[in-house]
Amino acid sequence: MAWSTRTMMSLALYTCFLWLLTSGLKTVQSLHDSHRGLAPTNVDFAFNMYRHLSTLDPHKNILISPVSVSMALAMMSLVAVGSKKNQFFQDVGFNLTEISKEEIYQSFEKLSHLLSKADSSLEMRMGNTMFLDQSLNMRDSFLTDIEHYHESEALTTDFKDGADAREHINRHVETKTQGEITHVFSDQDSPAPLTLVNYNVLKGMWELPISPENTRDEDFHVSENSTVRVPMMFQSGVIGYLHDSEIPCQLVQMQYLKNGTTFFILPDEGQMDAVTAALHRDTVERWDKLLTKRLVNLYIPRVYMSGTYNLEDVLEGMGITGLFTNQTDFLDISQDPPQKASKIVHKVMLQLDEKDEPPVTTTEAPPQTTSEPLTLTFNKPFIIMMFDSFTWSSLLLGKIMNPA
């Protein structure tokens, strides 16, 4: 049976909530096992969004944080009202006769708390800030609901002066991300009287150190007719590797210390679209089973990259509606609704660079391999997937068309 994008999104969010509400006082191990079972449906929604963005501009870099998008959508459910509120909850898979709004909000607060407290060297600064026009007389119940979210807040600003509003928003997010994200809005962008900014900054410490001394400037082939010079990092070690016989690609699985894991997928020449079309949960499950440990000489570009998206436009393009768009939709949260509605901005920043740290001491014997080292060079467009193995959340999904 073929499932629509909307159905896949519903399953992803609903199963995530169901797990959180029933987890109770489970141990870390049972938490890990339970979330492993829920991960596939969450991956489906991420791939659907990724494929949609790919069709908009096949030659453009893509960088999204699926778990952050889910949190932003849940937060925006606070402001959808009337029939649109009901439609929105149906779109994301909720039955309000079986689960209350309070339980939904508490569930996402728990997930955010788990991600922020996970024992991992993956540095992540994730949050949501809602900026409200200071002329709005917001209902106390709405502001109280906003405070239910861990790492979420509601701030007022003057939207009459668009330049001042942009500066206020940009400065606040820059502070929250410790200078990593500096321009959520450019001079050409206009925030709405209710603007939600969802941000995620991702860095990490490799399990196997990458020395900056081995980094060299090398060619990266953006296309047949375009080549750029990029800092190419080098690492040699025993890692998970697969040359897929069905999908035209090679891939490696890299570990961050403790709970972070990343897949780097290198399509064969001219096969990016074919690999993108094949990205499904079954594909990831098959890769996980077929990966084998072997000695790899790996060359991969240093990456400092960001992605910015208007989520309302993206979701509308995916056929997902239900968020408010006009003045009457504000009546449930404000006594003085504005003429213009909302904007949801999703901003992601990724840093993949050298971390010349000593290896982690372990009592486990290293995997044995007798094969000759394989050389794999990511010198053309590739795909990256990043997960937190403690909560089994999809932290990042991206397509690197040009790392320069």
From Swiss-Prot:
Annotated keywords: Glycoprotein, Lipid-binding, Secreted, Signal, Steroid-binding, Transport
Signal peptide, first to last residue: 1-30
CDD domains: serpinA6_CBG (cd19554)
Site (Conserved cysteine within steroid binding domain): C249
Cellular component terms per the entry's GO annotation: extracellular space
Chief location category: secreted
PROSITE patterns in the cross-refs: SERPIN
Highest taxon listed in the record's lineage: Eukaryota
GO-annotated molecular function: serine-type endopeptidase inhibitor activity; steroid binding
Tissues showing expression: Expressed by the liver; secreted in plasma.
Positions annotated with a glycan in the UniProt record: N95, N225, N259, N326
Residues annotated as binding cortisol: Q253, E285, W392
Free-text note regarding domains: Proteolytic cleavage leads to an important conformation change. This reduces the affinity for steroids.
Family (UniProt): Belongs to the serpin family.
Stated name of the protein: Corticosteroid-binding globulin
Native species: Mesocricetus auratus (Golden hamster)
